[in-house]
């Protein structure tokens, strides 16, 4: 899988297919969006909102949630606002989000089955 991706990337760069995607690091619409990492949203969300490359800062995680006051999501939003000119933040959820139905004990069992030590999970 990795070699296939790297080969595609080499050809992409050699053909200069990146040129139509070039933009600045500053979002044209001065907008940041926090949303879920669900693969169904990859192209659907920007299309549904009429967004183009370079217009927004898109921050994604499982469930599109802020879990910690100084975690990665807040850090990303702070950088967007304080350094990149973002003036508005949208938090966008979606229907049938898998994170909503996840149970911590089931996740814990999956981690144990993969060899994660129980004492690590109790920290």
Feature map (PLM): residue ranges:
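Gly/Ser/Thr-rich loops at beta-strand to alpha-helix junctions
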Residues: 37-40, 95-99
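Glycine/charged-rich beta-loop-alpha catalytic/anionic-binding loops adjacent to active sites
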Residues: 53-64
């Amino acid at each position: 899988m990795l070699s296939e991706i790297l080969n595609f990337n080499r050809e992409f760069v050699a053909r200069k297919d990146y040129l139509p995607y070039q933009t600045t690091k500053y979002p044209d619409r001065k907008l940041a969006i926090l949303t879920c990492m669900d693969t169904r949203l990859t192209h659907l969300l920007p299309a549904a909102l009429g967004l183009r490359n370079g217009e927004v800062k898109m921050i994604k995680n499982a469930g599109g949630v802020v879990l910690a006051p100084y975690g990665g999501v807040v850090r990303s939003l702070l950088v967007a606002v304080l350094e990149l000119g973002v003036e508005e933040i949208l938090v966008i959820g979606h229907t049938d989000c898998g994170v909503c139905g996840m149970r911590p004990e089931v996740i814990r069992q999956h981690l144990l089955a993969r060899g994660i030590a129980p004492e690590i999970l109790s920290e």
